[in-house]
């Protein structure tokens, strides 16, 4: 982005620049020299040098996160890059003796069920234009494979159109300084440009760190089960820089840092999984079900932070000073709130902590869920509504809950929301949308992408035009979030002496208003066959006569003295989305109560 389109920078001179300025024209004394400052002054005629202005000395624990803006000026990422991928079989030792059909058949969940690592194939990656590979670009004139390729992603790995991770082999070159090329189809996202839009926006936000992105037109030639072939059109992808040690170094961060990709993590202690590698019971797969290790394997700093954070006797003001950067969390959260990127309360974010620092920072990751309210309305899918809108979306996360309960953090978040609201103005979003449409619509309305696009052309036009409006709606929703009670969890009912015991966690109100609950029990999730209903319940529990064996639904809502109502965290999943504030359970013939669970 142009400089005038950025949020004004509040930059501190780098240490190297400061030292260079101080040392210019100065004699450097050799180690162990006995020449004194006074002697040096005498040698210069007794005239004392003028006092120089120095940048104040900073502590490592007080450093704000800043990206390397010059990194984005090296390459033009505003258009489309054409990539050619020739895949072939490799060998058993490197897990590459597989077919391209196998790569595209199995999901991440299939590999977990089979207990095997993800299959790979050998690949030759070449970069060029629509006429073919170009001189001077990666892979030009090369015939032997220079990479491996496998599927990437979790839930997206079940899609017909896969995401791919292309990993260039050592000493086989790199593309824009990157050896891992992540290609994302964003198949469930109707516009196909939201993730790139997010990272392009983040470039202009000093308080956040982004990643390099590029639209890619991919062609694949499959030689895994045949001797010859042609390049087939795989449509439009978005390349997103892989967040690893190489990326940390490129962005001016510490490559020896602790870096975790959050798979599912709400900042609880998780004693059974989050352990030191020296612990005899340490299991990496269990650990990585919560946090995928991308940096240092020394987890002691992480454990120390989690133990302090989960000790409610520890003042959050002090913890924010010691273990977190308020600015970083506030701007990260403000961006997610304004863009409606709700699937960030327990995943789709990285944790980063520099070596020799106790501070943890949030790094943005995966934004294809942003600004999708209008799209979900048009396709008739219910998600990211109810408590998932606004600050209540983050209430189930220990870190975010304790932040929101702290006045200093709320003030910082208020300021960040206001500043980013001005930055994410309608003119900017409309201009960016027009640019992305001019690129992506060349590809998405033709094969192969048009077959899997979840929206029609008229719907696409409506969705794209509504993006600025969604930001404004989210901005207006933000202060409303503090007026409502916070969401809470419904407990699993229990049978005791012929009665059904119903319970839930207490709700929280920022103004400490009285809260009452409405409790309902029904045979259906639409609550047309209600068996029990009670309003103005004061305590987080009640009971009713035990029904017979069968499937049941409990719904609990909290209302404060001002009349604002909030749903419970629980929801029941149907084909068209979520039914909020509802828990499904079964009473078995032997009297056992079983909660209805499912995989997201």
Give the role of each language-model region:
Residues 2-20:
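N-terminal secretory signal peptides and thylakoid transit peptides that target proteins
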Residues 39-197:
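Conserved NTP-binding catalytic cores of kinases and kinase-like/nucleotidyltransferase enzymes
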Residues 59-61, 93, 159, 295-303, ...:
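Middle-to-C-terminal accessory/interaction subdomains
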Residues 170-172, 208-211, 227-334, 342:
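Internal "kinase-insert"/substrate-recognition segments embedded within catalytic cores
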Residues 546-565:
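Beta-strand-rich modules
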